[in-house]
Amino acid sequence: MKKYAPYIFIVGLFLCLYGTLQVRPIRWDMTDDKHYSLSEASKALLRQTDAPIEVTLLLDGDLNAGFRRLKKATEETIEEMGVYGNLSLTLRSREGTKLQDSLGLRPIVIHEREQNGKTAQTTVYPYAIMQYKGRKAVVTLLKNTRGLSGEENLNASIEQLEFAFMEALHLLQQQETPRVAILEGHGEPDEAHTYDLMSALSKYFAVDRGNLSPTLPSREGDTVPVNVHILDGYKAVLVIDPQTAFSEQERFIIDQYIMRGGAVLWAVNGVRFSEQALQSNGFTPILPLELGLTDMLFRYGVRVNPALVQDIQCLPIPVNVSNDPQSPNLQPMPWTYAPLLLTSQGSPITKNMGQVMSTFVSPIDAVGGEDGIEKRVLLATSTASRVTATPGEVDLNDLNPDMTAFQYQYVPVAVSMEGVFQSAFAHRMMPEGIESDEPIRKTSARTRQIVVGSGSILLNETQKGQALPMGYDRYSGMQFSNRDFAANALLWLTDSEGLISLREKSVVLRLLNDKRAHEKRVQVQVISTILPVAILAIIGGIVLVVRKRKYERV
């Protein structure tokens, strides 16, 4: 019995270890980029589930190598999700179009050139359907960013898989839709020009529009005081392209809303101009736009400058180059006042996002130094920009500017801020017309703000009374990432669970050299097939020789 004791001990230890791992499995992600790990925010969200979750994967069929990689990564993400929380995930693939058509999902057509020179066409549905407690959510697996190659888009899609599934699960778990408010009363764009913005936000929020001005008369003829808590029911407030100044009461209400932890998206221009005058006369003067917000924003940590940026990387506009008014000849010409903005890869708001379309944008400076506010540039110009100060003039004839004047690089036009802010009313009296039962708050709870140097980024154009998509240029037919920017900005402002940070996940893209792979193809095939057999043959031969010599001695 003692002879077999070590073996019994080893077998017993193995069985105990196996039983322990069955009850409490240990998962160890040894990849550099933690590709197979979920964040703590995702684990917490999954543990909150109290009913089974069913996932139907529609990405199936005759897929190329890139989409097979995306499918495998999706299955791995779903498998990892199944480890945490009270849930049961099922993976099913469907090739038919009945389910897809019922949900209005559009397929992606892939054209690939085969080795014989022919072009093959494949239709795929890069979607997954998530069901929880009778509710459904569509998860889009493929993120198609303009300007990126196919491999880069697939890699970006893999990076965003965890966020895509967690976002869908968060929406399915949500019992009450959070509310956001768009402020009015200062010449802001009408609902027709914010239609697509409201449509994009309606997936996540209930969107209200309202006026803060205390204009309702009382019986005594005075205005009715406005309660300082009027905005407290909203997760975030949007100030989009105002044209007239804010009153002292409105400024105070917004300031104290921020002090109580409210989040604000400011999309304000530093310059006053007239697009109508530009279209009818061919030019418009540009002057500083006085909104009464300069001191507030400066106190919070940024300054929207009374100037406009110009950029060589810009949208074209149709211009009549014909001298004959009876025979117009419209040609696309670069319009430097409509810059195509670069997005920062260092923020979860703009990571893996394409360019953002804009017109008449003011530059933004970060101020305050060591004020404890974390500031990140979200949008910036290209490496060939210039800044036009006010007062000045914008002229349509200025379509061939001096290229040597574009000396600025990466001018910030959108900045995010997070931290504890100082009140703009810290050492001032409370304005008249305010109803409040508490003293002025001088410092805020930890909160977030975003400042954008133009309202155009969040607006859509209209054509024949119909709203066009946000970020769509009707002259070139190109679609930019304005819609994603708006949605991600609001998700970041209102994110208390840390889910938006999942967009910062990075997966290293390790690509083969296609040319070298083709040249070495036969060599690699020979080595991978013959070498293992040769090694086995050598080992087998050595074993036979050793055994033969051993038994010859006997």
Segments (PLM) and residue ranges:
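Juxtamembrane amphipathic/hinge helix adjacent to a transmembrane helix
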Residues: 492-520
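Short linear, low-complexity motifs centered on an aromatic residue
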Residues: 180-182, 313-315, 551
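Glycine- and acidic
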Residues: 27, 60, 184, 278-279, ...
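Intrinsically disordered or highly flexible coil/loop and linker segments, enriched in small
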Residues: 51, 178, 306, 426, ...
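C-terminal signal-anchor/stop-transfer transmembrane helix together with its immediate cytosolic
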Residues: 1-32, 511-554
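A short, polar/proline- and glycine-enriched secondary-structure boundary/capping micro-motif
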Residues: 148-151, 389, 462-463, 511-513
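Juxtamembrane extramembrane loops of integral membrane proteins
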Residues: 4-244, 248-251, 269
